[in-house]
From Swiss-Prot:
Signal peptide boundaries: 1-19
Protein name listed in UniProt: Venom allergen 2
CDD domains in the record: Sol_i_2
Compartment(s): Secreted
Top-level lineage group: Eukaryota
Principal cellular location given in the protein's record: secreted
Quaternary structure and partners: Homodimer; disulfide-linked.
Name of one Pfam family that matches: Sol_i_2
Family in the record: Belongs to the ant venom allergen 2/4 family.
Tissue expression from the record: Expressed by the venom gland.
Disulfide bonds: 34-57, 81-94, 101-122
Key words, A-Z: Allergen, Disulfide bond, Secreted, Signal
Gene Ontology CC terms: extracellular region
Length: 138
C-alpha cells in the first residue's frame, strides 16, 4: 500500500513538472517569436526580458489582458507568476508586485492596451523579470 501511495505521489509530481515545463516552453517560444517580430528601437534595452513590448506581446498571446476587468487581469497575472518563477519567495514577491501594479495602473481613463503596457512596465521596474526561469536560461 505504501508503495502504491508513493508511486501515485511521484506520478502526480512528474505530471506537475511536465505541465510546468510544457508551459515554460510555450512562453519561451512566445517571447522568442515576439522578439523576432517586434522592431527594436534605438533606446530599448538589448535584453529582451527587459523590454516592455516583448513582455506585452508574450502575455497577450497567453490571454493575460483579454478581459479589461482589473480583477481578472490581477488573477491572470498572479497565475503567470507561478508559471514563470520557481522560487516560492520570488513567486510571492511577484504576486505582490502584480497586485500593486494592477491596482495602480488600472486607475484612470486609459486604453486597455496602455493599462497592460503600464502594468508590465511597473513589474519590470520592480525587478520581477530577473527572478523568472526565463532570465536564468537565456
Amino acid at each position: 500500500m505504501k508503495s502504491f501511495v508513493l508511486a501515485t505521489c511521484l506520478l502526480g509530481f512528474a505530471q506537475i513538472i511536465y505541465a510546468d515545463n510544457k508551459e515554460l516552453k510555450i512562453i519561451r517560444k512566445d517571447v522568442a517569436e515576439c522578439l523576432r517580430t517586434l522592431p527594436k528601437c534605438g533606446n530599448q534595452p538589448d535584453d529582451p526580458l527587459a523590454r516592455v513590448d516583448v513582455w506585452h506581446c508574450a502575455m497577450a498571446k497567453r490571454g493575460v489582458y483579454d478581459n479589461p476587468d482589473p480583477a481578472v487581469i490581477k488573477e491572470r497575472s498572479m497565475k503567470m507568476c507561478t508559471k514563470i518563477i520557481t522560487d516560492p519567495a520570488n513567486v510571492e514577491n511577484c504576486k505582490k508586485v502584480a497586485s500593486r501594479c494592477v491596482d495602480r495602473e488600472t486607475q484612470g481613463p486609459k486604453s486597455n492596451r496602455q493599462k497592460a503596457v503600464n502594468i508590465i512596465g511597473c513589474a519590470l521596474r520592480a525587478g520581477v523579470a530577473e527572478t523568472t526561469v526565463l532570465a536564468r536560461k537565456k
